[in-house]
Design a protein with these regions (language model features):
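Hydrophobic small-molecule pocket/channel-lining residues, especially in calycin-type beta-barrels
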Residues: 1-155
Length: 155
């Protein structure tokens, strides 16, 4: 049996490994809670991220969404590819741009935003990472739609 070492470039995603929790804000002023668990999978060849986000509907009701992402590196091109599985049964594919402590990718446009394009930015910080969702409504430039500071609570 032959084993292949994981691509060294995956190390750039290492800041996403661990347990993270944060409270975020939406552009319209509402808040939400997010939990993320990131871990290496399949002998370190892939990163999995299990996520849940809870949005308060009223004083007694929360709208909770779950998703899981698997991130790997395409052998031929060296590009970072993510497959995201949602609790709505969707499978989304994203190509990631990975720079020093920063990950950017095109994301789904929030349905109530009436935007044309959305992108997500994950930025490494001393406490974990920040996640920003930006939208472009009319081609005039991106604006922040949501922001959450995710603090590492466990390795």
């Amino acid at each position: 049996m032959s084993h292949v070492a994981p691509p060294p470039s995956l190390g750039a995603l290492g800041f996403l490994v661990g347990r993270f929790r944060g409270e975020g804000t939406l552009q319209r002023g509402a808040t939400f809670e997010k939990d993320v668990v990131g871990r290496w999978e399949v002998a370190g060849h892939f990163l999995s991220l299990s996520m849940s986000a809870s949005y308060r509907v009223n004083d007694r009701v929360m709208d909770v969404h779950h998703a899981m992402a698997l991130v790997g590196v395409e052998r031929g091109s060296g590009a970072f590819q993510a497959h995201v599985f949602t609790d709505g049964g969707e499978i989304l594919e994203h190509r990631l741009i990975v720079e020093d402590g920063r990950i950017t990718f095109g994301d789904r446009v929030p349905h109530e935003s009436r935007a044309r394009v959305a992108r997500k930015i994950l930025l490494r910080t001393p406490y974990g990472y920040d996640e920003t969702l930006e939208i472009d409504r009319d081609g005039g430039g991106f604006e922040t739609y949501s922001f959450v500071r995710l603090e590492r609570i466990a390795e």
